[in-house]
Amino acid sequence: LNLAAESGEFIAVLGPNGVGKSTLLGTILGTRKLTAGSVDVNCRVGFIPQQRMFPADLPLRARDLVSLSLAHGAFRRRRPPRHRVDELLAEVGATGLRDRRVGQLSGGQQQLIRQAQALANDPELILADEPLLSLDPARQQDTVEKLDALRRERGTSIIFVTHGINPVLGVTDKVLYLAPGGHTFGAVDEVMRSDVLSELYGSKVNVLNVDGRLIVV
């Protein structure tokens, strides 16, 4: 697999369970070891992890978690300014959650806090591992729009793992499709085709366009 994320590029990573989508992000982050090849990351990275609930009795507020993320970045030698923490929470639409204990938040609310943490170091590359899980449709759209604005306004590159292309179809530049039989990488109209995916899976796959939405059958 050869993959390069250009400045401001939005790459959607698709494929069934168990093909290595999360492993790919872990390799880029450096939490998974390579058996061959190399990964070069020469920029600040923000990471939105796959949804896992915080313990219900965790005695930290949303503001505390975001503050900890800042403390490991530019403000690591001093206490992060409170206004910067509040700015990050506002950026993801979580201002009203700042003083609530994270363990008492819903899965979708916790995911917003993780988004704020990912933005703490002003990343040049964001790795997002299924960040739309637990979010209602309005929040999903809001999340995609915010990431799209980041890459357009700041040149932030986005590598976005998802099970479905449709929520990000309008902002995706390229698709990396991982399958048990291999992978393919290219523009949406080059990858999301019946013949391409059929060859990847080794069996008949149909890609249908229904009212502007792609359905893989």
PLM segments and residue spans:
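H-loop/switch region of ABC-family ATPase nucleotide-binding domains
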Residues: 162-163
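Helix-to-loop junction immediately C-terminal to a conserved catalytic motif
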Residues: 29
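Conserved catalytic motifs of ABC-family nucleotide-binding domains
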Residues: 122
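ABC ATPase nucleotide-binding domains
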Residues: 194, 200-217
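Catalytic Walker B motif of ABC-type/P-loop ATPase nucleotide-binding domains
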Residues: 126-130
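Conserved ABC ATPase signature
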Residues: 101-105
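Conserved ABC ATPase "signature" region
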Residues: 80-97
